[in-house]
Curated annotation (Swiss-Prot):
It comes from Bacillus cereus (strain ATCC 10987 / NRS 248). NCBIfam families: eIF-2B_rel, PRK05720.1, salvage_mtnA. Keywords: Amino-acid biosynthesis, Isomerase, Methionine biosynthesis. InterPro entries: IF-2B-related, IF-M1Pi, IF_2B-like_C, Initiation_fac_2B_a/b/d, M1Pi_N, NagB/RpiA_transferase-like. Substrate binds at R51, G52, A53, R94, Q199, N250, K251. It holds the Pfam family IF-2B. This is Methylthioribose-1-phosphate isomerase. The active site is at D240 (proton donor). Pathway: Amino-acid biosynthesis; L-methionine biosynthesis via salvage pathway; L-methionine from S-methyl-5-thio-alpha-D-ribose 1-phosphate: step 1/6. Homodimer.
Amino acid sequence: MSTIVTIPRSVSWKGDAIAVLNQTKLPHSTEYKTLTTIEEVWKSIVMLEVRGAPAIGIVAAFGLALVAKKYTTLHIEEFQKKFNRDCNYLGTSRPTAVNLFWAIDRMRESIQEITTIKEAQKILEEEALLIQQEDEAVCRSIGEHALSCFQDGDNILTICNAGSIATAKYGTALAPFYIGKEKGVHLHAYACETRPVLQGGRLTTWELKQAGIDVTLITDNTAAHAIQTKEINAIIVGADRIVANGDTANKIGTMNLAILAKYFGIPFYVAAPLSTFDITKQTGAEIVIEERDETEVTKIFGKQVTPVGTTVYNPAFDVTPNELITGIITERGIIRGDYKREIASLFEKTS
């Protein structure tokens, strides 16, 4: 029996503006923010108003389509020059999220051979919309493949938010929960709160509750105890960058969960689209890890909670070694075993 599930969206194209669900306001208010300039798009990404690797790529694509409409130049050469400058500018917003650069490169390549400004503007808008539409289909496919890894009644642990509001729709790590709900397969989510910005506590719980999916919130340091006492059957996470050998960058704390999964003998899955793979890098050691402002740790909702002047180390991501990963779930299926060979083979087939 199929069920209609309410699935929130995070990015909408309005033709002359972009509407983004301001995720910094969740769960207390559902506020959509209107972006009309490339600077506002950049700031929205940096400030985590829009977040999640696929969603960042989508909003960046729309941002480039938007700014291209506002160029006043009459010559295509000058248009391309300005466009490349804005591509480079947007690329400075979140250095670890490979989908950002994938979307920027795709937008850039879409108009490489175009000879008129009007045609370039039209193609950029069409390409951005296509990126969003494709991501929705990709996420649904990831959800279908991921659901095959689980059984009705499973308790599944996740971290951060790799859900619908981090993508075009459905999400990656959360996609099987939505697809399962539609198909009558009950999966219970255990969500790590995900310090310091609380994407699990604020966002994952919010969107799953919106859809009527069972979710239990735990503190990050409860994970081992929860696996031990709550019959956690598996762990599933998203990804911000997966390199050629399968090493995976994701929200800080992900590697902790992978180590716990190994110890307790439960599967640890990564769910991500092919656009999250960066096969130009051979191992996780080559991934640049973004470090964020110390106030994310020293303050909670603006209130100082540590002694002033405390030294802080605040990386946004960690890298999980491939040997800790049971399988990488993509829109093309599940990669297992020799990740370097399987990933290379997958990209040979798609090229």
